[in-house]
Amino acid sequence: EVYTFSLRLCDNEVDRDWERFDTAALNTLGDLFVGKSGIFDHQWSARGQAARIYRTELVRDEGVLTEAGEPLCYLKGYAYMLRTEGNRDLIAEIEGGIKKEVSVGCAVKRAECSICGSDMGRCAHEKGKRYDGRLCCARLLEATDAFEFSFVAVPAQPRAGVMKRAGGSPSL
């Protein structure tokens, strides 16, 4: 028997690290995250594997604009884990809202300055500062790999986390 739940993995809003994914990178990550593990605190250990993503979708919220003035979109993941005695407490913590926040481990080809378009670090602009009213952040472009999603205490992306318990058996 399996337990399923959905996640907001990442979005195109500026995060706590002053970075944001572009929509194309989120779309690519959607394909790359299928089959990836859910672990804890980005600790890459087979012992920590608790869940696995079996499906993703890019969700667009046309009614909400990001700091950059673009329609908000996010990568929604669907994950499963086995209903075992060892996972009983984790499932209870997910259902109770204790284990809620998540973060993703991934790679992108480029991080571009939102002010001038140069590779981040090759210009004088600093992430988190405003220039003529525009917030400087790193635009994360051209996703190349997805490693895992992790349950964490404080995610870089404030809205990332378990969305709701999905329940019984998924169509894998």
State what each model feature region is.
Residues E1-L172:
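Signature of dsDNA virion morphogenesis modules
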